Swiss-Prot record:
Name of the top EC class for this enzyme: transferase
Pathway: Glycolipid biosynthesis; lipid IV(A) biosynthesis; lipid IV(A) from (3R)-3-hydroxytetradecanoyl-[acyl-carrier-protein] and UDP-N-acetyl-alpha-D-glucosamine: step 3/6
Protein name (database record): UDP-3-O-(3-hydroxymyristoyl)glucosamine N-acyltransferase
Gene source species: Wigglesworthia glossinidia brevipalpis
Keyword annotations of the record: Acyltransferase, Lipid A biosynthesis, Lipid biosynthesis, Lipid metabolism, Repeat, Transferase
GO molecular function: N-acyltransferase activity; UDP-3-O-(R-3-hydroxymyristoyl)-glucosamine N-acyltransferase activity
Length: 340
């Protein structure tokens, strides 16, 4: 972590500074748990209530919150983006010294670029191609004929199966498995016959994948993750799924096979999406939704029942279970009314 003058902070985040330009900032704290000597930020007006009790020495905020700020202030158009810029500058990522650790097993037929770190107990199989500036943590497995682009980081205990293609500037967190066989079986006389999966997983540039996420290889064609996609922890992406550029997928999402999702979509946590359907660009699906049919129009889509008092939930569920009976009763009442 770097210590930095407020004048330098204002330059980094393109802010107008109100306060002592020579004041030294020691770090970044949240507005709720602020500390003297630290800088905090407000990106929504609902956090304005914390300003009177805030102990931070400086605040990043929008112009409309400036009258409520008694601390040194840095006014920007978008406080959240400004905060991200500052974090990236102040908290420098520690890069291990480039080397291959003694317990790593690297095939002689693997092709390694410049500045490669390979951690303990990692296995790199034949004909793997690693570009430049790659970090591979301990306990990883990279199957044969895999290609990994420059500036990509595989965290500890990541598994990349054969033939996978990963682009530049990607990050795959611990426990994730890329390129397993998909859930493909044929039923013959009541018995299941496994279908070999011949496709690959192809991941674009600037993709981030969280921990314990699984992405299956395609059955014939490839499973494709577009440029700039971000995927949270514990997501299941089945065979032949195609995800468009800059789509964000929150934790616990389950996607069935041959689903196509457009670009710039947001999929809320724990949503379940049917296979063999198409979701167009710029769709937002709220958390815990179940999507059964294609979505052809951009917008916000929801399903499911939010939590409520148990008594109320039981009554509402009883009404839903009896909806057809209630419908018939209403029809009978309307018939009698019309006769009058």
């Amino acid at each position: 972590m770097l210590e930095i003058k407020l004048s330098d902070v204002s330059k980094i985040i393109s802010a107008k500074l109100y306060g002592d330009k020579n004041f030294i900032i020691k770090g970044i704290s949240s507005i709720e748990d602020s500390k003297p000597g630290y800088i905090s930020f407000i990106y929504k007006n609902k956090f304005r209530k914390y300003l009177p009790s805030c102990k931070a020495s400086a605040i990043i905020l929008a112009k409309d919150n400036l009258p409520f700020c008694k601390q040194f202030a840095l006014v920007v158009k978008d406080p959240y983006i400004a905060y991200v810029k500052l974090v990236k500058f102040m908290y420098v990522k520690k890069i291990p010294k480039y080397r291959i650790r003694s317990t790593a097993i690297v095939s002689k037929k693997a092709i390694l670029g410049k500045n490669i770190y390979i951690g303990h107990n990692t296995v790199i199989e034949s004909k793997v191609k690693l570009e430049n500036n790659i970090i591979i943590g301990s306990g990883c497995f990279i199957g044969e004929n895999t290609i990994i682009g420059s500036n990509t980081h595989l965290w500890d205990n990541t598994t990349i199966h054969h033939g996978t293609i990963i682009g530049n500037n990607c990050s795959i967190q611990s426990g994730s498995v890329i390129g397993s066989d998909g859930f493909g079986y044929a039923n013959k006389n009541g018995s299941w016959i496994k279908i070999p999966h011949l496709g690959k997983v192809v991941i674009g540039n600037n993709v981030e994948i969280g921990s314990s996420t699984t992405i299956d290889r395609g059955s014939i064609d490839n499973t494709v993750i577009g440029n700039g996609v971000i995927i949270d922890n514990q997501c299941q992406i089945a065979h032949n799924v195609i995800i468009g550029e800059n789509t964000a997928i929150a934790g616990g999402v389950v996607m069935a096979g041959s689903l196509i999702i457009g670009s710039n979509c947001i999929i809320g946590g724990a949503s379940v999406i049917n296979g063999h359907i198409i979701i167009c660009d710029r769709v937002k699906i709220t958390g815990m939704s179940m999507v059964m049919r294609s979505i052809k129009t951009p917008g916000i889509y929801s399903s499911g029942v939010p939590a409520q008092l148990n008594k109320k939930w039981k009554k509402n569920t009883a009404l839903i279970m009896n909806i057809n009976k209630i419908k018939k009763q209403i029809k009978e009442i309307l018939k009698k009314y019309k006769k009058k």
